[in-house]
């Protein structure tokens, strides 16, 4: 054994090791958007989309969670990772294998074999044995490999939660766009009805000798464009049904049952008081990055352990016999066994082990950099959504004022036209302005609804990891041992 240590010293790590450092969450400065946001002690609810108060949306998100092929793939990856963890863990246990064979040997009587005692006779060549092996794992290689596989299983579970959150967000955003298209269609249809009334009025004025053919032509001119916009919006609504059906893993026929949404957001989302430190355990993508770092750290341990001798305890016992009756090999005199240690050690490998350690070190640094980037992006997304929400709240007020002003202008122009105090061009301009401002108001409201979803997702969507975090990340920013 002592010799093995001396020989294994021929291969050294050569100073190869990781260089990455984890970024402490509390080291990231929060901006005014986060500091000014109302704080509470609560994170988003796991069923956060229910604040929109739309039963149809609730039902379709439930359908998507149950039927989405993307979630099914994520769940399969989790099962695969857990199975791989079981395979790795089994290497730490006692391995027992049994073998047995029964063979009857007929001996020929030709000149090559005989004549002799066995000529034209038969014998039995039988054996049965148990083989046992156990890895002592003196340097923790098998334990580290098992822990690495388990960490990867945890990572897959976090990635599944991230896939679920992304699916929920995609359904909500598609549903909001679906609702916006209905609102825009309603505006376009109302505009069409108004324009047709204007055409009828122009025609009556012409018949009464008060109007001109030019006024009638002006009233007719916008109609084709309004019809085109209506057709375009009806197409968008049909495509929206297909999109929502596909997100739920359904066919287009199921999407045809979707009715006009009835979204109503009457709540404000406050920020948790422990941001950004507790963001580590709330966002699935951050949690997955943490488990990736932990897994790569265990991979470093495996690479280090490969430089040392591997010692296994092996044994075999059983019965064997050549000759005699079929069951004669089971007698006590035919019993045999052997037991002892088996040693394998690296001596010269052309730099393979150092290359593997270098690769493991690079993998750890890559995982650390990925985690740091994920954390930075997570905090940025929270700030972005808060800035967007504050801006949209102001835009909503301005948009409502613009619609009210445009409607008042249109009403005044219409009354003046009916009384012959102005020409039709002023009415048409006022109507166009009202139509445009109504569209802007609907777009701002849809953006507000989406901004709420964006902020919830930025905070992790209520899919808390709980205690499912690497131990080294319990203390924020602590470097994973490796």
List each model region and its residues.
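Flexible, surface-exposed loop regions and adjacent strand-edge segments
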Residues: 114-119, 262, 329-333
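Short flexible linkers and secondary-structure junctions
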Residues: 11-170, 311, 315, 347-357
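Periplasmic alpha-helical coiled-coil/stalk elements that build and connect Gram-negative outer-membrane
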Residues: 11, 142, 151, 158-275, ...
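Sec/SRP-type N-terminal targeting helices
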Residues: 72-73, 89, 136-164, 214, ...
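Terminal intrinsically disordered/low-complexity segments used for targeting and assembly
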Residues: 1-66, 126, 150, 234-281, ...
